Amino acid sequence: MPISRLKMNRKLISTLVVIFVMVASYASTAHEIPKPSFTIGVSLINDKALDGLAGTGVTIDDNDITAYFTVDYYVSPSLSFEGGVITGHEVSASLPSNASGTWHGTKSYSTSGALTITTKTDNSYLFGVKYEPSTTGSLSVYGKAGLMFWDVDFIVSGSGTLTYNGSTYNSKTFLQVDGSDPYIGLGLSYEISKNTSFAFDYVTTASTNAIEGVALDLSGYSISWLRKF
């Protein structure tokens, strides 16, 4: 089993243990358990994957817009399992000729001619828990945490040539990495009818390890529409 997959499985096991303990604590106090719900939303993502290239003459565009879909299954009035998918996104950095430095830890890079490096993150999948304390009004707060599973390609394009970690690349993918990292989030929701709400939240990853020097470092603000079945 690849090291990255082994680490991912260990994280998943740890998360499931935490979820089990939380469920055991709250399920005993459950009264009327809400119906399952689904959420559709959009996020403004900030991805710091290319921030290590910052320097003179370098232009970095580290924002993109994604969409997401999640399903929540309640095990108590306040606690639910959450699973979903986030659409892919990409960010880019334009580098001048003769730029050089270290990136992804101790890996060296240099450019011959101007070029653009783009990271393309495929659809990411998440699994976690969401906690929303009971309230008497329409406005409520919630927190969530879990694991995000991701897959990212680093691509060089343009007339220049990139030398990365001792190898030379031109107009091609030079690095592919996949893994998983914890995420945490806080949000506000407003109930507009018995089974429908709007929500606004902030989510960020909490990278615990780097795979081939790459650590997922995302954050984003989201607006969404929630509907209970």
Predicted regions mapped to residue ranges:
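Repeated loop/turn-to-beta-strand initiation elements of outer-membrane beta-barrel proteins
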Residues: 38, 78-83, 137-141, 190, ...
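Membrane-embedded beta-strand positions in outer-membrane beta-barrel channels/transporters
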Residues: 39, 68-72, 126-128, 183-185, ...
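Short glycine/proline- and aromatic-enriched beta-strand/turn motifs that initiate or cap beta-hairpins
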Residues: 27-74, 81, 149
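Extracellular/periplasm-exposed beta-strand and loop segments of Gram-negative cell-envelope proteins
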Residues: 46-64, 86-124, 150-179, 204-218
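Outer-membrane beta-barrel proteins
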Residues: 28-29, 68, 75-77, 129-135, ...
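Residue-level signature of outer-membrane beta-barrel architecture
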Residues: 44, 73, 85, 131-133, ...
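Cleavable N-terminal export/targeting peptides
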Residues: 1-35
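Outer-membrane beta-barrel "beta-signal"
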Residues: 37-39, 190, 217-229
